[in-house]
Amino acid sequence: MRIIITGGGTGGHIYPALAFLKYLKQEEPDTEVLYIGTKKGLESKIVPRAGIQLKTVDIQGLRRSLSPQNIKTAYKFFKSVSDAKKIMKDFKPDVVLGTGGYVAGPVVFAAAQLKIPTIIHEGNSFPGITNRFLAKKVDRIAVGFHAAEQYFPSEKTSFTGNPRAQEVADAAAQVEKFEQPTVVIFGGSRGALKLNNAFIEALPELAKRSFKTVYASGEIYYDDYKETFDQYKENPNLDIRPYINNMTELLAKSQLFLGRSGSTTIAEVTALGLPAVYVPSPNVTADQQTKNAQEYVDQGAAIIVKDEELNGQSLVEAISDILENTEKYQEMQRASLKAGVPDASQRLYNLVKEISN
């Protein structure tokens, strides 16, 4: 198979694509892959590091308000469509897969115009503007949340889950749990100021609880709090770090997750059957993180603490209410396992094979 994948801007569009490619290579080792992104997006660093060929087009996001910049964006869109067509005529893909982000717009649009089989994957519960635009033009639509199905034509939409779920589930298959109940608190790669402030407030109480807390502040914040963190560095119930490098292994060993509710995070957490306390970021488009988390709250796999209600007391109460209540923990664990999609890459692969044939 020859496949072009496009998607970028944030890790939520890139990491699912790379997880799928890893599975695809296992199934079809001779697969030829080309990734199309932008020079300034996160994909420009992540994709080459993964050993995947990257080509770029020059595109920028559309402003949601009236702006002269949108004229420039429109010009760049059609220029990128033209550039993408040239790349495709040279590479000759059997299928083109878009995973979201504004770069996917002109690339998948170009493929559809060239009559190349196309599929998009929507990772969030509320679709982004790019995938809503592409929905009528592509052959298949894969979604990571059941809530997203209502926004797309039912006859070509399938629930697959997020490919990161299968990658995490496979990697964690042989990992044993910590003996001491453990919660992982993580505010994303850069950290979250509100979460850091709540954690500082909660430290005296967390230090004496029956469970262990592994906390990542984010590298840009760690030095600001180091003096306080150092007061607790000998406490066996606390493991405080700037960043978590081995997140998959750590989550697999732990019993609970507390943090933001990005689509990839939720896929990883449910693939491992972890209960979760989600604190949706208020700084994302269309309040996507709240919508993401709500689907799993409705299934009994998670609870939500609103960002504006997060403080030391609410943080400790949310954790202890789950980890110190065996019956509630087990109910949430079962719900999380049921909600997880540990075969997400296989499901997406089946759709890709269907249209590429």
UniProtKB/Swiss-Prot annotation:
Q: Which reaction does it catalyse?
A: Mur2Ac(oyl-L-Ala-gamma-D-Glu-L-Lys-D-Ala-D-Ala)-di-trans,octa-cis-undecaprenyl diphosphate + UDP-N-acetyl-alpha-D-glucosamine = beta-D-GlcNAc-(1->4)-Mur2Ac(oyl-L-Ala-gamma-D-Glu-L-Lys-D-Ala-D-Ala)-di-trans,octa-cis-undecaprenyl diphosphate + UDP + H(+)
Q: How does it sit in the membrane?
A: Peripheral membrane protein
- GO terms for MF: undecaprenyldiphospho-muramoylpentapeptide beta-N-acetylglucosaminyltransferase activity
The compartments listed are: Cell membrane
Listed Pfam families: Glyco_tran_28_C, Glyco_transf_28
Q: What is its EC number?
A: 2.4.1.227
**Pathway the protein takes part in:** Cell wall biogenesis; peptidoglycan biosynthesis
The UniProt entry's GO CC annotations, sorted and at most eight, read: plasma membrane
Its domain of life?
A: Bacteria
Q: What GO terms describe the biological role, i.e. biological process, of this protein?
A: carbohydrate metabolic process; cell division; cell wall organization; lipid glycosylation; peptidoglycan biosynthetic process; regulation of cell shape
UniProt keyword Iron-sulfur present: no
Family membership noted in the UniProt record: Belongs to the glycosyltransferase 28 family. MurG subfamily.
Give the protein's function: Cell wall formation. Catalyzes the transfer of a GlcNAc subunit on undecaprenyl-pyrophosphoryl-MurNAc-pentapeptide (lipid intermediate I) to form undecaprenyl-pyrophosphoryl-MurNAc-(pentapeptide)GlcNAc (lipid intermediate II).
> Which protein are we looking at?
UDP-N-acetylglucosamine--N-acetylmuramyl-(pentapeptide) pyrophosphoryl-undecaprenol N-acetylglucosamine transferase
Q: Which organism is it from?
A: Lactococcus lactis subsp. cremoris (strain MG1363)
Q: Which gene encodes it?
A: murG
